Amino acid sequence: VDVLSTAERLADEVLFPAALTTDTADAVPVDLLDTLAEAGLYGLSGPISAGGVDADFPTVCSVVEKLASGCLTTTFVWVQHLGAVIAAAGSDNAAIGDWVSPLCRGQRRAGLALGGAIPGRPLLRARETENGWTFTGTSPYVSGWNRVDVIHTAARTDDGRLVWALIDARESATLIVERLTLVALNATATVRADLLEHDVPAQRVTSVGPYREGPVPPEPLRIHAALALGVAMRCCRLLGATPLDEELARVRAELDRLDPATIQAARGSAGEVALRAAAALAVATGSRSLLVGDHAQRLIREALFGLVYALRPGSRDAVLVQLRAAP
């Protein structure tokens, strides 16, 4: 499967034509996610033996960028799934092995809850029990509610271990969600999830290991940047040839180096370029860009999302410098 050609075709022929409708929907249309599954993209990072593509990291980044150029909302719900595939495929827990193929084929779909993995005081705590674990706390942003089957959830123990598990994406007395209203990507159906002594069977645990606080590895920052690059790429295509094309290529090349010393600034640059490209498209479009039926206004809001989503201090500082707003 030529996943790059497939991603480009789906972005141009399926996601982009539906993007304005998706933007105003209550949740991403299921048929769009089904299309990605049928194309094999839910298994992008999964093993071939389980129905995956086993794409290398540069290919994953390119696919994310191409899909994001079609519709950031749909892409964002889908991309949350990829980490669960990698975790399940690499798990030492034999019971998790049964999940790998359904996840790769998109028969089971996963969201992401990072409450226990966020630096500082853990928002989500894990306590070991006779049959597994209980999770208590909050994950402030969980996307894809009612579109995912499980949530790949991180919780931290009092003795400094990080527990990852697949928990059912289903409300209960111990898992309560509150729908959030977003100015961009609202159809991601993002919720705040509160867990109270929520039982997690040992069979659902993908990994348990030491929690290490430190700089974010380059790879997740590169994926975050790919979302913004996709928005910028679509804006550049709608604008036609401009100096922004070369600037976008330079930022992408710097990100591809995965240099720990520059990746945070480069991730910030991706969001800043997307914002300027979207603003340029709005100006070129004129007053039509104020209409909810025009792509320019959607792309400006998506660029805002790409600018601030999961923004780390190093990236934030770099963006403020670029915006000439650094203290």
Residue ranges and their predicted role:
Residues 28-38, 42-143:
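Glycine-rich flavin
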Residues 130-134, 150, 190:
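A generic structural signal for beta-strand entry/edge sites
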